[in-house]
A protein has these predicted regions:
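Short acidic-glycine-tyrosine-enriched beta hairpin
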Residues: 81-99
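Glycine- and acidic-residue-biased ligand/ion/polar-headgroup-sensing regions
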Residues: 63-76, 80
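Single conserved hydrophobic/aromatic residue that forms the stacking wall/gate
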Residues: 1-9
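Acidic/histidine-enriched, glycine/proline-rich intrinsically disordered or flexible terminal extensions
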Residues: 120-133
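Asparagine-centered strand-capping/turn motif at beta-strand->loop junctions
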Residues: 6, 102-104
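A short glycine-rich, His/Asp/Glu-containing loop-to-beta-strand
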Residues: 22-65
């Protein structure tokens, strides 16, 4: 981008873009991607794709339950310190307060349904990584 175009962007467009409050519906990350599929008053449905060898943080939520349905691939889930293998068709339920994570052995696609009265990205407590996985 030329410096003139960059200046126009900073002065004329950036203030508008910065003020958007619309929720991000798709994002690519180093570990894979996610796409928000449905938003309701007390639920949020997301398709999560983890790249082979990648994992999500070990974490919990205070105000929401989560249900994972594995729709493609194989990997491992850790739920409250217990590791188990997961594959296409498996369904896992994590109540609020439960520590959990996924690790992809192959590409792993999961439908994640978040259930609760106050679903928020701030409702996530991270824990140190588990060793070994």
């Amino acid at each position: 981008r030329s410096s003139a175009a960059s200046d126009v962007y900073k002065r004329q467009i950036k203030p508008y873009v910065s003020s958007f409050t619309q929720q991000v519906m798709f994002a690519e990350k180093s570990w894979g991607s996610f796409r928000i599929m449905d938003v309701e008053k007390e639920s949020l449905t997301i398709k999560v794709t983890l790249n082979p060898g990648h994992k999500m943080n070990y974490h919990s939520h205070e105000f929401r339950d989560e249900v994972w349905t594995v729709i493609y691939g194989e990997g491992r889930a850790v739920i409250d310190g217990e590791e188990r293998r997961v594959k296409t068709g498996d369904v896992l339920r994590m109540p609020a307060g439960c520590r959990h994570m996924l690790l992809a052995d192959t590409e792993l696609q999961v439908i994640e349904v978040q259930l609760g009265k106050d679903i928020s990205v701030q409702d996530k407590k991270k824990y140190p990584p588990l060793k070994p996985l």
